[in-house]
């Protein structure tokens, strides 16, 4: 199973070690930044990326349990600047993201080494 899916403003992760699914929606502009993290279900994860419009993917993600929000815009915050709804889920999502990043780096290094060997 694919462990990472991505759209314009969203990224979803599957952690095979824990069997959990997470998604992040992030908006950035000159006005500021907004970030929302969710713990999603396998059903939501499997449907992500099947829509022709990313807005539909974001709507699907928003049906899940929100675990974290961050809003910092030039218009002021819409509540507490940072709100952690579920600390354990947020930490699990960050660990999953880190695993994905390490995995992607290793794959990139392998690909680079393979390309160097092919040039010799």
Segments (PLM) and residue ranges:
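Long, compositionally biased stretches
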Residues: 1-30, 67-75
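A short, exposed loop/beta-hairpin motif centered on an aromatic-Gly-Thr core
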Residues: 34-46
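Mixed-charge, Lys/Arg-enriched low-complexity segments
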Residues: 44-110, 120
């Amino acid at each position: 199973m694919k462990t990472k899916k991505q759209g314009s403003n969203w990224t979803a992760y599957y952690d095979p070690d824990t069997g959990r699914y997470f998604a992040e929606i992030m908006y950035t502009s000159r006005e500021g930044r907004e970030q929302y993290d969710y713990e999603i279900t396998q059903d939501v994860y499997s449907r992500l990326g099947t829509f022709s419009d990313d807005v539909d993917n974001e709507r699907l993600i928003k049906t899940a349990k929100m675990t974290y929000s961050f809003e910092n815009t030039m218009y002021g915050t819409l509540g507490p600047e940072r709100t952690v709804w579920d600390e354990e889920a947020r930490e699990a999502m960050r660990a999953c993201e880190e695993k994905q990043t390490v995995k992607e780096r290793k794959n990139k290094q392998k690909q680079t080494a393979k390309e160097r060997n092919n040039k010799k």
